[in-house]
Amino acid sequence: MEHFDVAIIGLGPAGSALARKLAGKMQVIALDKKHQCGTEGFSKPCGGLLAPDAQRSFIRDGLTLPVDVIANPQIFSVKTVDVAASLTRNYQRSYININRHAFDLWMKSLIPASVEVYHDSLCRKIWREDDKWHVIFRADGWEQHISARYLVGADGANSMVRRHLYPDHQIRKYVAIQQWFAEKHPVPFYSCIFDNEITDCYSWSISKDGYFIFGGAYPMKDGQTRFTTLKEKMSAFQFQFGKAVKSEKCTVLFPSRWQDFVCGKDNAFLIGEAAGFISASSLEGISYALDSAEILRAVLLKQPEKSNAAYWRATRKLRLKLFGKIVKSRCLTAPALRKWIMRSGVAHIPQLKDYPTRFTSPTSRM
């Protein structure tokens, strides 16, 4: 049985960033259910927008995005829709439109060869024995058993590591549903949709590489029905759908209290969405995945005597920021307050009507 310093379960943005940062400094093994390349296998349903905080993480690490990760077009505003109030407003945003699956695979490709990575693998069992973490996983057609001093759960909303560490922990969950359609809108756009009759979270749309993606986060029990109902309502706001090219769904966490942020214990750590590090106001998680990976890197390399306590303290600022997102979410999902904010016109950028969308030469108008 092989022994490692660190075993990382999951190679989304959080796990990939941590594996890359620990490479050459600690002996690391990393397991991921995605394939190494291509579109086969698991891919995470996601609107695919890189927030400014995530962009800052790449600046800090000296990384630039390759062109095959960036999607077309780049959109500079979010069309915010209040369905019940029949209000639409445009707010400036500085997101980068990306292909999420290509982004995840690119993040994995940055992990140096010194890290032992198993793609298309399945973690079957974890337990703690003799001050070590033991992991049984299936990869390359057979089961393997390894041990590690530190275990890191970077395995997302349905984290096996979180369930093992906190079997009684309850956090609000939604089913995120997305459908892809051939783009029919004359002007591509990104939208954020609020309808309290459908969900107390929110829905979204994004134009991407010739497709129109429509999705949202809905109650687990009847999410599909609510999603379909909202699609029907959106025709009143000039949303155009047609026949779905692809449908996706996954579980998404929705932290609603301070106790929803859990960081680990007994030399096991949680990063990214597995720790509850996801914005309640936007469901954006990439920036917090990257930030928590950087925080844990610093803790593990120092190897303090009480590493879990050190990680808990080090994430306090991050957790406070995310708690602020919980407060913001409650404001955004309160119908009366949201209606008042949108009607006030604060930060709204009106779109000019009957204005040429392309520059034309003087002769072309003759």
Curated annotation (Swiss-Prot):
Pfam families: FAD_binding_3. GO terms for molecular function: FAD binding. InterPro entries: FAD-bd, FAD/NAD-bd_sf, Geranylgeranyl_reductase. It comes from the Bacteria. Belongs to the CbrA family. This is Protein CbrA. It comes from Escherichia coli O9:H4 (strain HS).
